[in-house]
């Protein structure tokens, strides 16, 4: 990455702090290859500067501003919130594989990595837990 494209150290530091905190909260690990983690963290920091939000750097967006407004790929993305699956490999199992246990059977992540168990099923999956609770409570009047 050339120096002019490098995000500010403040945004890099902000995203490192976020990544560490979210990994702890979600019961995941940061990728054991620090180079992978650094690349993703810098990509998130770069998107903060470009679109004002930490948009997932592992996707191509024809219109990053429009994608940021949709919020589905803001870190932690919808897939992480619902299935605890990070296709960027930022939030992974201790051995560096993405957690696939909660993915639908036909999801590309399950096909690519097989079944990778969730080391801490009691943590993370915030969106999935809300949906499960609402389903258990039944319809509201």
What are these regions (language model features)?
Residues 2-135:
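Long, distal/terminal scaffolding or interaction modules
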Residues 139-140:
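Intrinsic disorder/low-complexity segments
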